[in-house]
């Protein structure tokens, strides 16, 4: 599909392809642009390519071909990528929290990218702590600031993950299946909270989901993926039965039957610290 004009975009993907070891094609010749302040849902079955596309936007996955360009320039391995990662926050399905630490300590890790390695070994300044407390308040967890994360419910843990992302003061949030492990009521609350905050702050959000009902309820734009490529890109109101059949019935005929859907990603230590 032809991407939207870069003048209207904070991120642009041009002819991106990702092939994992073993010949597994996770993404093929994909082009798309993401507009400022838009809440976009990447919709599709497991293995459709949505997580690979999402992670490619922050170079958690290294493309086999093509390019990703932000307002800072093409994202390779230099300063443009470092600056892009600083302004791009991640929210993960399994929280990626330090369970024995408090909610506040976890949210403060969102501030580490603003300090050099030596400074991050010591308690962060009061200003950072105030930012972290404010972020916890925004997700309704001010009273849980000093509670250990492993004592919180799954929904509360995911809200800590959102607060950590907000502490990074991002221009972009990438959320990879953020409600896959939550019950329906909690999922609606978490997605509604995330969408409202992104709208209030003008944050561009790109969220991968497999649940159609959530895409219809929360998305400004739905990008449907099947067989490692984009097959739909429009407002959720434009989804037809035929298009849904294509998104949800798409099966790869080129990948081995026992190939992993989208292999796990090992994060670089520097990126792990910056989250």
Curated annotation (Swiss-Prot):
Q: Does the keyword ATP-binding apply?
A: yes
Which residues are recorded as binding ATP?
A: 44-51
Q: Which domain of life is it from?
A: Bacteria
Q: Write down the membrane topology.
A: Peripheral membrane protein
Q: What is the lineage of its organism?
A: Bacteria, Pseudomonadati, Pseudomonadota, Gammaproteobacteria, Pseudomonadales
In the record, the note on similarity to other proteins reads: Belongs to the ABC transporter superfamily. Phosphonates importer (TC 3.A.1.9.1) family.
Q: Which Pfam families match?
A: ABC_tran
Describe the protein's quaternary organization and the partners it interacts with.
The complex is composed of two ATP-binding proteins (PtxA), two transmembrane proteins (PtxC) and a solute-binding protein (PtxB).
Function text: Part of the ABC transporter complex PtxABC involved in phosphite import. Responsible for energy coupling to the transport system.
Query: Could you state a single Gene Ontology molecular function term?
Result: ATP hydrolysis activity
Q: Which reaction does it catalyse?
A: phosphite(out) + ATP + H2O = phosphite(in) + ADP + phosphate + H(+)
Record-given protein name: Phosphite import ATP-binding protein PxtA
Q: Where is the ABC transporter domain?
A: 11-252
Q: What is its EC number?
A: 7.6.2.-
Query: What GO terms fall under cellular component here?
Result: plasma membrane
Locate the region Disordered.
251-275
Keywords per UniProt? ATP-binding, Cell inner membrane, Cell membrane, Membrane, Nucleotide-binding, Translocase, Transport
The answer on whether this UniProt entry bears the keyword Membrane reads yes
Gene (UniProt): ptxA
Compartments, as annotated in UniProt: Cell inner membrane
